[in-house]
């Protein structure tokens, strides 16, 4: 069975990916995180789990990252932040480390070995086509409220699209996300939808990565609900307000609370 690398394993999407993969028969998981105790606290079932290998360290540790992604089918790049952090570039830094790790592995692998595909968690809000149904004034508000994060995503996407043909990336661009139960999903190339649970998002990412015909490689892919929308995240208003403050007054960042979808 296939092996998958999850980068950003302690986040909402990372834990949802691990949850889904644990329910996939035979799937092996390489979870990369900065803080193993935090991951164990969030997911106690991972302690001594035979199908899970945890890699604890910095994303700048190319040797450790190469060990994590070696022999995998897909690399789920879900390293990001819910807060509009000025100067944010965690997405780009992670993507650059992934490419450096892949290049180091290429020198060790037999010629013709197919590298794992990258599945990047991005956002439908920055995609004019997927989010065209959203009122323009509200889209401007959302783009400002996460301006620093979205700029990081744009730069990350541009970097990955500039890679040689042998490196394939799927760009997952959901609408609003919520911590909620799994209801059922469908991959959608035409529009995003709000709200989608992290569990449904994760299932969609795995489906796209596993597509036998590679139909989603290089494409912007969103996620639709098939059995009702996820609940409204109560933390959204505060997240938007503090994001707008960080956009207009970046120096306020250190004084503002950390937020999340909730």
UniProtKB/Swiss-Prot annotation:
Entry keyword Nucleotide-binding: no
SUPFAM superfamilies in UniProt: NAD(P)-binding Rossmann-fold domains
Domain of life assignment: Eukaryota
Disruption phenotype: Leads to total loss of monodictyphenone and agnestin biosynthesis and accumulates emodin but only traces of chrysophanol.
Its EC number(s): 1.-.-.-
Pfam families noted in UniProt: NAD_binding_10 (PF13460)
Keyword Acyltransferase: no
GO MF, one annotated term: monooxygenase activity
Key words, A-Z: Monooxygenase, Oxidoreductase
InterPro entries found in the cross-reference section: NAD(P)-bd_dom, NAD(P)-bd_dom_sf
Pathway: Secondary metabolite biosynthesis
Enzyme class (EC, first level): oxidoreductase
Function in brief: Oxidoreductase; part of the gene cluster that mediates the biosynthesis of agnestins, dihydroxy-xanthone metabolites. The pathway begins with the assembly and cyclization of atrochrysone thioester by the non-reducing polyketide synthase Agnpks1. The atrochrysone carboxyl ACP thioesterase AgnL7 then breaks the thioester bond and releases the atrochrysone carboxylic acid as the first enzyme-free intermediate.
Protein family: Belongs to the avfA family.
Name used for this protein in its record: Oxidoreductase AgnL4
Source organism phylogeny: Eukaryota, Fungi, Dikarya, Ascomycota, Pezizomycotina
